[in-house]
Amino acid sequence: ALPKGFFCTADEALTRAQVEALHPDVILHTAALSDTSYCAQHPAEAYRANVELPVWLARAAQQTTAKLVAFSSDQVYAGVQQQGPLPETLALHPANIYGQYKLKAEQRVLELCPDSVHLRASWMYDLPGYGLPIRGNLPLNLLRAALKGEALRFSRNDHRGVTYVRQVIENLEPAMALPGGVYNFGSGNAENMVCTAR
């Protein structure tokens, strides 16, 4: 594992050197700048984190013969009008910068590393009790709003799965054996986010 915060200051050469020193069989890339509002306000920073960094890791994976498994996002589907399960082969034009950059990363990395695996993760959540920091997630946001008597806004046009992070972890090892490509990775959800939040 790389030190916490490593990618905040690393460049491509340092990234490659670290990967070469570790010489892993698999590179599991989970880092991202995923706050969609922040990405829209800071597109250069978002591009570096969400496109350049995965490309650097792809080049390092090529040189070390490591398999790259990278987390993408269901935000690549943002703006899709089609309802129901969405196939990975759907033509996409993401409605937000974060989704656009994650899609671009998938495409560029697959050009460099056709055997790389890209997991389009849904909105994940964890629960307190493991001694780990908990970021905002749907169940905790709903609980917090209910306790404070605050309203939350959701869109009927937003169709997303919501996945318990422990299920994601349990399925990571099998995902490492997948052939190169893009995969939806998480719980399905036939409802829009208004219905899901209720």
Predicted region positions:
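NAD(P)H-binding glycine-rich loop region in Rossmannoid oxidoreductase-like domains
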Residues: 9-49, 62
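SDR active-site strand-loop-helix element
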Residues: 27-31, 68-74, 80, 119-121
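Conserved catalytic-core motifs of eukaryotic protein kinase domains, centered on the activation segment
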Residues: 37-44, 79-83, 130
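Catalytic phosphate/metal-binding cores of nucleic-acid and nucleotide-processing enzymes, i.e., regions
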Residues: 46-47, 82, 165, 181
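Catalytic helix-loop patch of NAD(P)-dependent Rossmann-fold dehydrogenases
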Residues: 48, 52-56, 76-119, 124-125, ...
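A short helix->loop->beta-strand "cap" motif at the edges of active sites that frequently abuts
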Residues: 63-67
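NAD(P)-dependent short-chain dehydrogenase/reductase
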Residues: 110-160, 166-167
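Mid/C-terminal beta-alpha module of Rossmann-like enzyme folds, strongest
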Residues: 171-172, 177-198
